[in-house]
């Protein structure tokens, strides 16, 4: 299984058409499945996650002795350094469908799967598997609860889990 970008999320980064060509080359090498994602963490971190970074929480969790200067910068200009990307469920689906049309190999959809209905939509669009992130961080029993037809994650995409992850 290989994880690859559908686009990088900034002007000079790879765009969809280029990433489709990369994926087609990967497919030629007999990879079992491809996980489709997007974003370049150091330049466009919230392309891959959506929502806003909780700047105060991020600064709070940073080591005050090692990163004092970064904590100070975050508190004053963090909102400019890490712009908010509005969250919507299945946020990569439209782009991922372009890859589905261009590739024959199994594809793993990732991006805003917050309930059973989202997973079923991705599977109905031709994706072979779904990958779930935030919803599992919020509730480790999420997959079992998805057996209920209308179950939806309680995750509000506050991204406090991301702030903590970046500071460990």
Segments (PLM) and residue ranges:
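Flavin-dependent oxidoreductase catalytic cores
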Residues: 1-168
């Amino acid at each position: 299984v290989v994880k690859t970008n559908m686009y990088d999320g900034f002007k000079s980064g790879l765009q969809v058409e280029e990433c489709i060509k990369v994926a087609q080359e990967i497919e030629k090498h007999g990879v079992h499945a491809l996980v489709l994602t997007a974003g370049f963490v150091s330049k466009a971190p919230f392309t891959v996650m959506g929502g806003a970074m909780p700047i105060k929480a991020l600064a709070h969790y940073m080591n005050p002795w090692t990163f004092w200067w970064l904590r100070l910068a975050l508190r004053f200009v963090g909102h400019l350094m890490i712009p908010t990307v509005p969250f919507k469920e299945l946020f990569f689906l439209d782009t991922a469908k372009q890859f589905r049309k261009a590739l024959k190999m199994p594809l793993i959809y990732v991006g805003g799967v917050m309930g059973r209905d989202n997973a079923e939509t991705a599977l109905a669009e031709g994706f072979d598997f779904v990958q779930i992130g935030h919803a599992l961080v919020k509730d480790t029993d999420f997959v079992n609860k998805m057996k209920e037809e209308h179950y939806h994650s309680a995750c509000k995409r506050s991204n406090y889990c991301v702030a903590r992850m970046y500071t460990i």
